[in-house]
Every structure is written in structure tokens, then in C-alpha cells.
Amino acid sequence: MDFQLVSDYRPRGDQGRAIQELVSGLAAGEQHQTLLGVTGSGKTFTMAKIIEQLNRPALILAHNKTLAAQLFHEFKQFFPDNAVEYFVSYYDYYQPEAYIPSGDLYIEKEATINEELDKLRLSATRSLFERRDAIIVSSVSCIYGLGSPEAYYGMLLLLEKGQKIRREDITRRLVEILYERNDGDFRRGTFRVRGDVIEVYPTYDEMAYRIELFGNEIDTLSQIDPLFGTVRQKYARLPIYPKSHYVVQPERKKTAIESILEELGVWEKQLESEGRLVESQRIHQRTRFDLEMIKSMGYCHGIENYSRHFSGRLPGEPPPTLLDYFPRDYLVFIDESHVTVPQLHGMWHGDRSRKQNLVDYGFRLPSAMDNRPLKFEEFETRTHQTIYVSATPGPYELTKSAGVVVEQIIRPTGLVDPEVEIRPIRGQIDDLLAEIRLRVERNERVLVTVLTKRMAEDLSGYYSEVGVKCRYMHSEIETLERVRLLRDLRRGEYDVLIGINLLREGLDLPEVSLVAILDADKEGFLRSSGSLIQTIGRAARHLSGRAILYADVMTDSIRRALDETDRRRTVQQAHNEEHGITPTSIMRSLDMSLVHILKAEYADLTSQDDAVPEFNTQQELDSYIGKLESDMREAAKKFEFEKAAKLRDNIKDLRTKEFLFS
């Protein structure tokens, strides 16, 4: 099926020229191109038009889950009839395995997997196997090791109507591809058997499958609702993919175990020859235990550290990743490339330094080093045609594109870059408060960037006390719950968002009319010219958009940012005058896909949950503590341990406080 872009938009402003130039470059075989698109110029629409015209599978690479979720939502709207998929890390919480020699401290791996994200990852690889009209929106998770596509596809269970096959053979094959039989609790990754009917709930789909047999022949193949059992559609052929990307062929498992034992013997001898007997004994015990688990259960804790043996790779050879699931002619768009490219560079180095200690001190075999993300050079060899997309391209992109940059400065809405005003630092908090109140009266939103977490929290606390509805956002409030936070800002549930590095989000917030940058003259990463341009651009989607920089010194970064903003404003205003365009604010739907995935809430200083009611008698206090204890036990039963711990701490605080009753 071809890509079919569904949109009321038509290319306007610079979009038509940018699309034509980039498509021509791709057709001419250009491997690297850069799209310099200002905030609100419709870069996502430009990418969508390029994909539609070239009709090739595409990988859209974003630098965090929040931006990836936003892009996924937009591409889903542009291509409702095509396969738009989402591929990010499936961990809600992840503590990697590590060893700290200075304190002789071993930290075991801990992780909480988000099943919804796991389903979306599996759905992404299924789409790449089954169709060419696939767009995968991904974070840097795409350069981390994944099961090999050959092994994953090789273990596929393909069923056809009229096929001669025994019921026992189908169930045996389902177990081989890691599905569990569970006739009572029908959930993702399980199957159940009722007479000659087998029902399978795959890990990559919302719906389940029903296989009806007549003797040893498949009579009917259907898609069913897993809750009600109603038939949605019928199939002539039905492929059932393995439960996990890390499925291992039975014959490969035996070879892998032999290979692990061989490596263990060599490594033990080397450690003993160096006089490191403790490390030798440790690696012997740990590896033998893991192998017994693999033999009996088919799995062990940390099995990914043996991935080189299971995939049959040579030492040092890169692991299979999502990139290996794409056909050779796929396109790569690296969004916010000035941030994403350095992130891709750093992944391998960070992973290697942690693993080296584990190997050196006998916690892992040397082959564990090959369970890693791709080096940047390996990533480059797996991508054949790349478009870097950014308002402030970095030196790598400009060098790779040989300085040839396609500019997209004119916004389809006619909006020009926001006016930038510089004000003194002294009195910045109260001066900003007055500006915030003006925006609140007009039902507009405000973004504030500060330099430290402490300042974000303190400023949020101060503004909340004086009646401003505000939230703060920093690195401790990570992952996809930010989608909910940003949606609530747009809805008007609060008016001010305070953060440290808001520019990195690629935030699409048309309701924001003011961006305030506190301490703008403190030179550094957060106040570089690129960072300032990105942050100022957050107000570029509003007709009254404005930026205030609080600074006492005109730094080189501020000067460069002002010069670039002025250049863009001049070009935009000239275009509007020439074509008689009246600027209008960007209007965008509040709907956000993927919000249902989020479980954690953001930090809210005005939350009523933590408020302690007033007590008039000791009985009221005792009654309230009793209610909290009941809630705590209930939370523990549901495995909501964070909530239970918070309630426990609240109870402890109440019991240690002295109350004066009237």
C-alpha cells in the first residue's frame, strides 16, 4: 500500500521549496541533508510530504520519549491508513547492573516494564516485516540490542485455513515462541485451549486470535475481542509472531550453552593466572547458576549479557538492532538533530564504562561487553539517506551536509519570530510575576527557564503562594508522564511551567505567549546561542509571542541569538508584506496519543492529596490516621509500593507532630 497523507494543510511559506529541494536531493542519491526549520514552520508536515512523495519506509528519530510521543501523534493524524508505530524503551523504571569498586558495592539490575510500550515495540517490528508503508517514530532505543530479525522471523508460526496440523503441534510451537498456556487468566502473551479451539492473545495486538480445528485440519482462523470473544474478522492465513524479540531457536540454545562454557573456562584460567581467585570463583558460580536456569527454564536474570552467544556473533561484532529490521532503502529523519546526534554519540561510551567494572571484578564474562548500543560509526553504516531536522543544526550535521542547508523560515501562519526584550536581573522574580498576571488575564500560558532544580522548585513554590497556578519540570520528573503535564498546560489547568532545559523538549505549545529566561547572561550549555534560540522559539506559535531575557551583561551567546532572531524576523516580515499575509496563531488539537500509557503524575505544589486537614479533637486525628493505614494496606495489596511508602511516611509524620486541639 502507498503512503496517503490526509490533511487539510497545503504546502505554504517555505514548505513547497523545502520539500522539492529535499526530494530532489534524495532522488539524486544525497546521503546527508539538513533542514533548518524554525519553530512552527511545519517541519513535521514537510517530513510527511517527503515520505508520501518517495513512498519509502521511514525512521523518525527523536531524543526523548516526550518528543517521540508528540511526533507519533502528528504522523498518526497525517497517515491514518498507514502503519505509524512507536518504538521507545519499555522500562518505566530502570536501574542497570553496576559495581563500584571503591565501596565494594554491587548493584543488581532492577527494572519495571511497561507492557503497553512493549506491545508498541513488537507492533513496530511486525509492521516492518509485513508492509512497506511503515513509519517508525523512535528514541535512541533503536540503537540498543534487539533479537536478530532472522531468528525472530524464523520462529514465526504461520497458519493457513485447510492446513493439516495437530492441535498438540500448534500448542507446542506456541510454547517454543514463549507463549504460556493459561486457561484461566487470558492476557497478553498467553493462549488457552478449549476442545478443538485454541485462542492466542499476542503481545503486539489489542485483539486476540481464534484457531478452530476440525480433527487435524484448521477449519477457521479469526480475530476476536479478548474480553467478549466476538469475531472481528476472518483470515485465510494467520502469522503469529514470537512473544518476545529475544526468542531463541532450540538448536541455537544448545550451541550457545557450549559456547558460554568454553568462554567461562578460558576466562577462569586467565583470572587464576593473574592471582585473582575471588573474581574467578565469583564468575564460576554466577555463570553456572545462569546456565542451569537457561537449561531448565529457558531464561535467566540478565540473559541479555549472553546475547552474543545466542545470536552467534563474533567478539566485538555489533548487536542486531531495530535498524536491521528495516529494508535497505529506508529514510532516516533525525529530529532536533543538534541534541539527538550528540546523544547517539554518547550511548556506547556510557554503557562500556559501566560494563568494564562488571567484567574486571568477575560479575560478568567479557562477552557481556557485546551486549551494547551501536557505536556512532556503526549507526552511520546502517543509515543510507538521512535528513537532519533542527532550528539550530550542530557542527556534525553541517559538515555532513557539506554546508548545504535547506531553510524553512517562513511559517504557513505568517507568524514572525517573537520580539526579544532584555531586562536587568535585579527584581526579575517580581517583574516576571507582573508579566505572568497579564498573560493569565488573557488566558495565555508562560514558560520560565531557570538554571537549577532547586530554583525551579523554589520559584514554583513562591508563585503558588501568591496565587499563580504553576508547575515545575526537571530531570526527576522524567519519561512519558511529561506528555500529561504538557497537555494540562495547554488545557489551562495551570498557567506557568517552570523548567531548566525546556528547549530540549521540541515543545509544541501554541497557547504559550511568553517565554522568560532567568539569568540569561550566565554562559554555559543552557545559555548558549543555540539554546537561547531554541527557547525563544517556544513563543513563536502565538500571535502575541514574546521573549524576555533577564541579563546584566550582553554575552556573545545573547548577541548571536538576537542577531539570528532579527534576521529571521526581517525575512518573515518582508514575505508577509510582499504577499499580503496577516499572521494568525497556530491552532492545534489538544488530543494526545499515548497519554493512557502514563501512570505517574507530575510534581504539583498545589495538589490537595498531600494536604493535612484540620483536626479539632484527638478522635478526629486517630480516625484520619486509621483511614491512611487502611489506604496504605490497600495500596500494598495492589503492589503500589510507592503510594504505600508515601502513606506510611504521612502516618509517621502525623504521629510525631503535636496538635493543639481547641
Language model feature labels by segment:
Residues M1-D2, L438, V571-K646, I651-S662:
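Acidic, low-complexity intrinsically disordered tails
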Residues M1-V595, E634:
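ASCE RecA-like P-loop NTPase motor cores
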